[in-house]
Amino acid sequence: MKIQSLSYLLVETTDLQEWDDYAKDVVGLMKNDSLSDDQNLYLRMDKKSFRFHITTGDSQKYLAAGFSLSNKAAFDDAKSELDRANIEYEELGDEIAKLRCVEECIGLNDPAGNRLELSYGSEDSSEPFISTQDIKGFITEGLGFGHVVFAAPDLELAHRFYIDILGFGDSDYMNFPMGPAPDAPEVKLNFMHCDNPRHHTVALYESPIPPSGLIHTMVEVNDIDEVGYGLDRAMQNNIHISSSLGRHSNDMMVSFYMQTPAGFDLEFGYDGWQVDWDNFEMQKSKIPSFWGHAFSPPEN
């Protein structure tokens, strides 16, 4: 199976306006007015019709991540591989495919219960992308919109699923103590790439599934100033800063983390490593960042 990229994120909310304000005033995303209504908010960050679909419901949480395949043949091959591996999936049908702005899509769960969708033929918008915060553009072309980090209580089981079933490749295994104490518990993460140069498209963090359903997602901008402006906007709008500015040790991303209305974090970064996979050896990292990234949980 050759998954090309992370194509979209689905989120449930009890307050659509809160997400609208967050996307417009902080992140700099563009609302797709032709798709959005009083129950659904479609958000753009490039030429695609949407990258985030926020829908009203009873809770604030992650619903699913969509991953794209190159064409119908690749999509059908992916379903055949799932069948051979006895992995259950759901044909989502024409109505859902229309909502996702794709030709066809299926839904499935990873071993931890994280909801995934596979699709092909994602639709481009007929309107140019114009950031509400004059961002020069997000780094998406050929890379997908960013990455996601899932919780996985059984890290090895989930890791094998992404490698053996979905066809991801290993980028990095990271483990480090959670704090300076000699008996501090160890943090363990697997970072994996799909069929594009982004250092990782999916990471797995060994932990129970959080109430928000997701650890974090990431978007990438073109320069360090855009990161700084984003940090300013977050603070000006009283958004909780989950992590200070820093540079990661594995993908070299300079970024900060802020809380979304759903409770999971959004990493807002620049300068992520685009890898030549033909000349790459899997990494084993002992520190999450070279500098910065002091994490601060919300008070409530």
List the predicted regions and their residue ranges.
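Short, charged/polar, Gly/Pro-enriched secondary-structure boundary elements
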Residues: 48-53, 113-116, 198-202, 264-265
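A compositional/structural signature marking long, glycine- and acidic/polar-rich segments
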Residues: 184, 189-190, 194-195, 199-249
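Core segments of cupin and vicinal oxygen chelate
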Residues: 1-50, 150-199
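N-terminal beta-strand motif that seeds the catalytic metal site of vicinal oxygen chelate
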Residues: 1-17, 62-67, 123-156, 169-171, ...
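Conserved active-site tyrosine of GNAT-family acetyltransferases
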Residues: 19-24, 82, 113, 158, ...
